[in-house]
Amino acid sequence: MFLYDARKGGVRGIRHKAGQSLIKFKNAGFTYGGRYILSEMNLHLQAGSFHFLTGPSGSGKTTFLNLCYQALMPTTGTVQIFEQDVRVMTRDDIAKMRRRIGVVHQNCQFLDHLSVRDNLMLPLVVSGRKDEIDQSSLDDLLSWVGLTDRGNALPPELSGGERQRAALARAVIMSPDLILADEPTGNVDWEMGQRLMALLVELNKMGKTILVATHDLNLIRKVKSELSARTLRISNTKLQLPGANL
């Protein structure tokens, strides 16, 4: 399988020890236009965990995820990613860190003139690692997300659900340790949302760490019936732990 490394006898991309904190927030905050969007955030995101991030629209869920891979810098406090303080990371540190994190956006973007297959390969091509996955492994990846017959299609030809599955495939092709998903089921129907969430659950069972921002409480309940997942909630700029009882 594309995520299994036969040479090492394990899942590709697992570079951490069980229980290690991959993301640490210590009194972290973020301001925009002089106003706090997030404040006094404290969190240890442990390796192998599955977390949901909830909160009203505009509460700062996307901002929180952006802080988790240094797309934004904290205004106050500290954020550590893979035990490195984001404030002192070099460009090389940032590049290495981002190779270990897969991101799935609600409105995923692709290069429309390239096939799905070529779009999936872009992260590896850009990072000089295209030889790390062969065509058979790429076929396995397409099959895993249910896009076996869509590899040669162009992005505009895909349905909303197919685009989201392609986005997930692109996020995991680098074999990341941590996967951040921002409303991955927001633009799809209930059935497709369940399929996407089932893939994230499968990744978690492989040892991947998952953080999903969502407002879909029914999907949260379904996942919680299958595995031990925690729910975090942002309210009035603060992060509530361990989260609301849903």
PLM feature spans:
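Hydrophobic anchor residue at the start of the ABC signature
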Residues: 168
